[in-house]
């Protein structure tokens, strides 16, 4: 499917829960979020149906997100079913890593191809602070489990926060040397909990990159948001995702579906289409709604302009 700007849209990011077993400061309020009823979120069958119809209309890549997707009961079966949908070539998962050791084998057997792990510090005390209680050792065990299972390259998503973890940039980059790990530095975005302090703590990826010596640029997939580099002799890669300082809207190939069934043509727009209602009342219209949503994708986001409306949703509600 192509949008009005002739971008090919083949990638669906679908959040299966807004619940999480962490409370990261820039993602979720300390007390958590209002717990929706089962009636208010997509069932696993509805998620599968949406992906199936998406595949019939050109979607071939799917990423399962949250919240923390591994806290949703039935996630293994969902991944297995999606991986068997004709046309789906790639299925990936974004997780905080705490439950990979527990579910890794089952995830691989279900057909999961790739895994992204969100981790913003390699220091136990600091990690516990930013996540409001997380155990770093569990995440590190999860990374090793993903490597053992061959889900490579294992991608680590690192949000760089000025005055907080910028002194760990080189430590993260060095993780790519001995293992097939891709470390991707992501600029802090003004969404939800982060909107109040994103400007004060924002660090551009040009600044981040300047702190890593010896990076060599490598060829990057044009549709990937990450600009990739490699340290000399490294098995993995270092990537930079710059949604603020150098957006990649011109090559955007994705749509998002939230756990409560809202189709979001753009992460940074408040415009949403109620796909949950369509799935329950007129499921035969799902394909048309997906197509319409794609046509409504804006040319670019308008962060930090007078056209931008700050999202009231947390990142866990939208889907990370």
Curated annotation (Swiss-Prot):
Gene that this polypeptide is encoded by: moaA
Protein name stated in the entry: GTP 3',8-cyclase
CDD domains: Radical_SAM (cd01335), Twitch_MoaA (cd21117)
EC number: 4.1.99.22
Keywords: 4Fe-4S, GTP-binding, Iron, Iron-sulfur, Lyase, Metal-binding, Molybdenum cofactor biosynthesis, Nucleotide-binding, S-adenosyl-L-methionine
Presence of keyword tRNA processing: no
Chain positions recorded as GTP binding sites: 13, 63, 94, 155, 254-256
Its job: Catalyzes the cyclization of GTP to (8S)-3',8-cyclo-7,8-dihydroguanosine 5'-triphosphate.
């Amino acid at each position: 499917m192509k949008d009005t700007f002739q971008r090919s849209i083949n990638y669906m990011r679908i959040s299966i829960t807004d619940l999480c077993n962490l409370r990261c400061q820039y993602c979720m309020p300390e007390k958590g979020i209002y717990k929706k009823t089962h009636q208010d979120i997509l069932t696993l069958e509805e998620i599968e149906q949406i992906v199936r119809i998406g595949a019939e209309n050109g979607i071939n890549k799917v990423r399962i997100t949250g919240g923390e997707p591994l806290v949703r009961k039935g996630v293994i079966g969902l991944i297995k079913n999606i991986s068997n949908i004709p046309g789906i070539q790639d299925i990936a998962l974004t997780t905080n890593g705490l439950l990979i050791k527990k579910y890794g084998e089952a995830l691989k057997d279900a057909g999961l191809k790739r895994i992204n792990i969100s981790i913003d510090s390699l220091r136990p005390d600091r990690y516990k602070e930013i996540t409001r209680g997380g155990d770093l050792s569990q995440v590190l065990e999860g990374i090793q489990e993903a490597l053992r299972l061959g889900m490579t390259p294992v991608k680590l998503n690192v949000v760089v926060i000025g005055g907080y973890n910028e002194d760990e940039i080189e430590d993260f980059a060095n993780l790519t040397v001995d293992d097939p790990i891709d470390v991707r530095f992501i600029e802090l975005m003004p969404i939800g909990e982060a909107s109040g302090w994103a400007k004060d703590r924002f660090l551009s990826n040009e600044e981040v990159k300047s702190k890593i010596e010896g990076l060599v640029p490598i060829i990057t997939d044009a549709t990937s948001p990450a600009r990739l580099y490699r340290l000399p002799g490294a098995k993995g890669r270092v990537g930079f995702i710059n949604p603020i300082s150098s957006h990649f809207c011109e090559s955007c190939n994705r749509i998002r579906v939230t756990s409560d069934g809202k189709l979001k043509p753009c992460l940074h727009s408040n415009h949403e289409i109620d796909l949950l209602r369509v799935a329950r009342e007129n499921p035969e219209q799902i394909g048309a709604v997906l197509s319409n949503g794609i046509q409504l994708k804006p040319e670019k986001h308008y962060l930090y302009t007078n056209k931008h409306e700050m999202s009231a949703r947390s990142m866990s509600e939208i889907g990370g």
